[in-house]
């Protein structure tokens, strides 16, 4: 899987360790759900003001959020499993407020890298069709997130 990362903010120091966490989590999710190696993911690192604008435009919420996901395609499980030579499966875009991630990491008492990894896992699962609209969906999604975090050694 190819993961493209763009840091669009300069309020928080974006480190090589953070970049590696994003790549590790993206690859762990891809492996767990058996995504084709031809899959592409885009991750944009932004600040609170940028994600607040997106949150207002796309969700009608006039406040900064931690992560937003924009699926490129709504694929069925069978379509995600297809590995056609030369065909690229563009999963979509994840936008993360690094400013929000750092503040949440302080609030929750863990590292910024762990919070960033969790937000990438959460965003990717949304791109793959998982949601948390009811308790059953929420429990499934949380279980997958914790398995991913365990796999990349970023447990709580």
Curated annotation (Swiss-Prot):
Its EC number is 3.1.-.-. It is found in: Cytoplasm. Binds 1 zinc ion. Zn(2+) binds at residues 122, 126, 132. It is an enzyme of class 3 (hydrolase). Its main location: cytoplasm. The keyword Metal-binding applies. Keywords: Cytoplasm, Endonuclease, Hydrolase, Metal-binding, Nuclease, Ribosome biogenesis, rRNA processing, Zinc. Its cofactor is Zn(2+). One of its GO terms (cellular component) is cytoplasm. Single strand-specific metallo-endoribonuclease involved in late-stage 70S ribosome quality control and in maturation of the 3' terminus of the 16S rRNA. One of its GO terms (molecular function) is metalloendopeptidase activity. PROSITE patterns: UPF0054. PANTHER family: ENDORIBONUCLEASE YBEY, CHLOROPLASTIC (PTHR46986:SF1). This is Endoribonuclease YbeY. It comes from the Bacteria. Belongs to the endoribonuclease YbeY family. GO terms for biological process: rRNA processing. The gene is ybeY. Signal peptide: none annotated. HAMAP family: Endoribonucl_YbeY (MF_00009).
